[in-house]
Amino acid sequence: MSQTDTCMSFLWAKKKEQNGRFFWLPLTLHLKDTMGVMDFLWHHWVSEGQKEIIIHALSDTGEEVVDTAQRLACFLAGIHDLGKCTPVFQTQKGYQNSPDLDIALLNRLEQAGLTGISSLNLDMAPRKRSHHTVTGEYLLQYFGVQQDIASVIGAHHGKPIDKEEVVTKLKLYPRDCFQDEKEGPCQRLWLAMQKQILERNLKKTGFIDSEENPTVDSLPEISEIGQVLLSGLVIMADWIASNEAYFPLIPLEENEPEAMENRLQCG
């Protein structure tokens, strides 16, 4: 396993302490859960009328436009929490857990190559400025995704984000997304993880070039009404995938559920 894969496997999306035991939800697992829920919603819940609106909102007009709409919905679900792959999120303290859980998660990232992450001091101002919806939209634009699609990620907690706020403010605070202000091993590792999450989701949903390499250039353009509907679907998929009764957190010492293949079906 590469350093990027190892470090990425230790990123958390959710964490809690219950009856003295530590539990967490790996970020990569939560993204898989949410994409799986979105696929189910598209095939079993979204009405034909809603699908038609989304389809007509796309720039694609070919015979495969229906497939493109479904793949785009799944891509957005699988990338919705990209903003959690940032130091400003990973250093957040839990509200109701022992500091030992926060420390344990940070120590694993430190040992995987993010030198200094366990002692990184980002005050509360960046947390308000750099909510993971904001950093998610910013990172997608950083990697070349157009604003129409990136804005869906920025809105997945119910509030669209002003483009100028996303781009201008975060450019001034590179530590929020990349840990260091200048290029170095930690900044390169964060960029590698963020890019890998993006590219794996592009490839999984079929947004590839003629040589089957993932590319943001294969993503369609989408009108405002389509953005609104897709934002709503991402919110719903995320809400369902965040329900611990259906998609429980796992013990801290585990990296994925023992019955991974049954997780989505049970959910």
PLM region spans:
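Accessory nucleic-acid engagement/destabilization modules that flank
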Residues: 3-8, 12-19, 27-41, 45-267
